[in-house]
């Protein structure tokens, strides 16, 4: 009888594994479909703007029925909000977790610049920022979610490190600590400028940002 119970136990474990496999596949398909919807939404929002973008066209790009979108997102606004979270929140988490206290302030600034250039300007994330800039005034909730998910998390980190730099004598004035927006202002300028005038007079964002850091901290890279 013990042998039969042992065999029965093995069979039960096998059945559990067999049952789990279809569930895993369904979960993977759901995640793939969700990612496809978000990718299609980004293309539509960039091509048409938030106001003119239609969920019908998002569904067509994602090659799904329109009704499928509502299984994942309540409406177009919630779809856009999730796009912001999905694309930018992990990057924000990386900045929040970075060990910045014991790094020279110029090195901190260069790290932030490099992250912006590689992970935002060099990717489709810059299109999300352009959308926020262009559509935010007409759709305040879109600006609100960007502020909550990105700015309200990153700005205190930067401000705190700049204030520490003032205390330590790394910075002779507290202007940057009071207005940390100054640190990244040229990066946003480059996003807007190259979106509007890049065909005529493109800005080299890396050269622009390092010239800006030289103005703020003196010439030369940190060691």
Language-model-derived ranges and their functions:
Residues 53, 79, 124-128, 141, ...:
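Alpha-helix N-cap and coil->helix boundary residues
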Residues 67:
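Key DNA-contact positions within bacterial/archaeal DNA-binding proteins
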Residues 120-148, 192-196:
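Amphipathic alpha-helical segments used for helix-helix packing
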Residues 219-223:
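C-terminal effector-binding regulatory domain of bacterial HTH transcription factors
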């Amino acid at each position: 009888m013990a042998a039969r119970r042992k065999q029965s136990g093995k069979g039960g474990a096998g059945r559990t594994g067999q049952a789990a496999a279809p569930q895993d596949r369904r979960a993977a398909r759901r995640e793939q479909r969700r990612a496809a919807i978000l990718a299609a939404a980004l293309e539509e929002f960039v091509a048409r703007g938030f106001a003119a973008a239609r969920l019908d066209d998002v569904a067509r790009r994602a090659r799904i029925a329109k009704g499928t979108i509502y299984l994942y997102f309540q409406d177009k606004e919630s779809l856009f909000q999730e796009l912001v979270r999905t694309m930018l929140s992990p990057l924000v988490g990386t900045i929040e977790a970075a060990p910045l206290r014991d790094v020279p302030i110029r090195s901190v600034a260069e790290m932030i610049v490099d992250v912006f250039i590689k992970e935002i300007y060099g990717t489709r994330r810059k299109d999300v920022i352009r959308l926020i800039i262009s559509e935010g005034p007409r759709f305040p909730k879109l600006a609100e979610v960007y502020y909550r998910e990105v700015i309200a998390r990153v700005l205190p980190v930067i401000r705190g490190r700049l204030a520490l730099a003032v205390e330590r004598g790394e910075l002779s004035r507290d202007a940057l600590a009071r207005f940390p927006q100054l640190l990244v202002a040229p990066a946003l300028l480059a996003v807007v400028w190259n979106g509007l005038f890049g065909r005529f007079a493109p800005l080299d964002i890396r050269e622009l940002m390092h010239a800006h850091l030289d103005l703020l901290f003196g010439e030369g890279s940190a060691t």
